[in-house]
Design a protein with these regions (language model features):
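Carbohydrate-active catalytic/glycan-binding domains of CAZyme proteins
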Residues: 1-306
Length: 306
């Protein structure tokens, strides 16, 4: 009963919006990219190809409560994403479009935890056309999946929703494979390898620096996606994983959360959550909540009749 009441309150007062932020590495001020008022945009990944920057992100329709994946070209002069197209839309929620280069081809691993899969897609016409080529892991509620290519192995980092007391933000698990395309992924023996809410959940692609690899994570201890952490990987083997905090980035002024970070060349990209202080948003949420309740009642009635 408590969970039901909590869910109603969360939906009724969901007066926030995720926005995409961007800046050059030598600058300190994050700039918010233009976007419609009726959507949230989050989980941005950026790719530099043939002299252009492309941004991949989750777009969440606030009224329909549905997330799908989009791609577009970053226009530096006009402060927005141009030529936006939906590249993946399913009946289930999609987010965190992890786009990466592997053996001179571009691939994407989105979050599809609602579908209980970790799927691999390949770009057949970058950046707008993809095809699913493989399910990496089945029957798994996994969030924010990223890969580390090291020592001729592929490590898949994820956070698994195991049961009601083990949320995505409370664990970090690792799977490993000898080949992304031609081998299966298997769990390392000591999963979950970490269970600290402040550091475990992924927040972007791995970053390779002069001193090694850094895992981007988000702090979910204070609130979901509060800040960004850079975790230096000290050891990773078939049986061991060790990391330490290298750096933290807090939300810019005016934002209450900051939970994805990626970089391409000298362009850094992130997302920030703002609070919408608007009575009409609250009224719209109340109407949408009533519609959702009546829809569930109607579906339940039909199922009983069957």
């Amino acid at each position: 009963m408590f969970n039901i009441i909590k869910k109603i309150i969360e939906n009724l007062f969901k007066t926030h919006q995720w926005c995409i932020l961007i800046k050059k590495s030598n600058e300190s001020v994050w700039v918010r990219l233009k976007q419609p008022k009726d959507v949230s945009r989050a989980d941005p990944f950026i790719v530099y190809k043939d002299g252009k920057y492309y941004i991949f992100f989750e777009e969440f329709d606030i009224k329909k409560r549905h997330g799908y994946l989009c791609a577009g070209e970053y226009c530096q002069n006009c402060n927005e994403i141009k030529n936006i197209r939906v590249i993946l839309n399913e009946k289930y929620h999609l987010s965190f479009p992890n786009v990466f280069l592997y053996k001179n081809e571009y691939y994407m691993i989105p979050e599809s935890s609602e579908n209980k899969t970790i799927d691999l897609y390949k770009f057949i016409n970058f950046p707008y056309s993809i095809v699913k080529i493989k399910t990496l892991v089945n029957d798994i509620g996994a969030a924010d999946n990223v890969l580390l290519f090291k020592d001729q192995k592929v490590y898949l980092f994820t956070s698994i929703y195991a049961h009601s007391r083990c949320l995505h933000s409370e664990n970090l698990s690792i799977y490993q494979s000898n080949d992304l395309l031609n081998d299966d992924f298997v769990e390392v023996h000591n999963n979950p390898v970490l269970t600290d809410k402040e550091f475990v959940r992924n927040g972007g692609r791995f970053i390779e620096g002069e001193s090694g690899f850094f895992r981007v994570s988000q702090d979910c201890k204070k609130r979901y996606g509060y800040k960004i952490n850079f975790m230096k990987v000290n050891k990773i083997t078939d049986t061991e994983y060790e990391e330490e905090v290298s750096k933290m980035i807090y939300p810019p002024k005016g934002y209450i959360a900051f939970h994805t970070y990626n970089i391409a060349n000298d362009i850094e990209i992130a997302d920030g959550k703002i609070v919408l202080k608007n009575l009409f948003v609250l009224i719209d949420n109340f109407i949408d909540l009533l519609k959702l309740i009546f829809k569930k009642i109607r579906i339940g009635f039909v199922n009983r009749q069957i």
